[in-house]
């Protein structure tokens, strides 16, 4: 598996680092302290040094990309992880790195960016993509709803992931709608539903 996806892993890791190049080109135009976290209504509530924003964040995301790949490729049941799911896993972080870092840099140089719209929209699309693949996901230890009940029973795994697929797609639509509304309670409720409903289904199915 390493050999098969070696080129993709190298490419996606370099893409995760690419915002560093953009940040260095904009270095002299950015202040020494940069807003890197935003609350509702695009109000900054977290700041980082320019060095951390330009170099630290892309380095962290590139390291996370490699760590995620190692986990995926080392899974004892990696043969059950389909090619589409592996490509999705390998491309999530680099695409996120590009969009998030470029939004931060744009805001730092005075270009108005609706961070709430961008972040909710990205998360929503990601949830929909994951939800689409959930029912096709076979038992493994890296992706999917990995709780004792689903790992113990193939039938439980299949039923839970069919339900989870719909839940995640609906959650993704809710997040896209929330990119316009930007309400915190929708975010928290959606994430809670995405986690608790599939786990609850797996638990109840095991007890039946």
What residue spans do the PLM features occupy?
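Ordered, amphipathic secondary-structure segments that act as subunit-interaction surfaces
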Residues: 69-117
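Small-residue-rich transmembrane alpha-helices that serve as helix-helix interface/gating elements
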Residues: 122, 185-200
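Residue-level detector of conserved catalytic or cofactor/ligand-binding positions
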Residues: 198-208
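Alpha-helical transmembrane segments
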Residues: 12, 46-61, 114-130
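Membrane-helix boundary/juxtamembrane motif in polytopic membrane proteins
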Residues: 143-167
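Active-site and channel-lining beta-strand-loop segments
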Residues: 23-55, 143-152
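Membrane-water interface of transmembrane alpha-helices
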Residues: 25-30, 62-74, 129-144, 203-205
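Select subsegments of transmembrane alpha-helices in polytopic membrane proteins
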Residues: 8-11, 54-60, 87-95, 158-169
């Amino acid at each position: 598996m390493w050999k098969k996806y070696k080129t993709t892993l190298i490419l996606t890791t370099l893409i995760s680092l690419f915002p560093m190049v953009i940040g260095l080109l904009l270095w002299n135009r950015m202040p020494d302290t940069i807003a890197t976290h935003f609350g509702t209504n695009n109000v900054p509530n977290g700041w980082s040094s320019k060095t951390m924003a330009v170099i630290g964040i892309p380095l962290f995301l590139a390291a996370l990309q490699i760590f995620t790949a190692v986990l995926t490729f080392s899974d004892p049941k990696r043969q059950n992880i389909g090619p589409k799911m592996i490509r999705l896993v390998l491309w999530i972080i680099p695409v996120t790195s590009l969009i998030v870092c470029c939004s931060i840099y744009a805001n730092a140089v005075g270009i108005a960016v609706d961070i709430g719209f961008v972040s909710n929209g990205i998360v929503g699309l990601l949830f929909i993509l994951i939800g689409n693949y959930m029912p096709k996901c076979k038992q493994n230890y890296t992706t999917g709803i990995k709780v004792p009940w689903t790992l113990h029973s193939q039938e439980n795994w299949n039923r839970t992931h069919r339900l989870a697929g719909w839940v995640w797609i609906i959650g993704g639509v809710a997040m896209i709608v929330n990119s316009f509304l930007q309400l915190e309670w929708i975010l928290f409720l959606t994430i809670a539903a995405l986690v608790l409903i599939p786990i609850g289904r797996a638990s109840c199915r095991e007890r039946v």
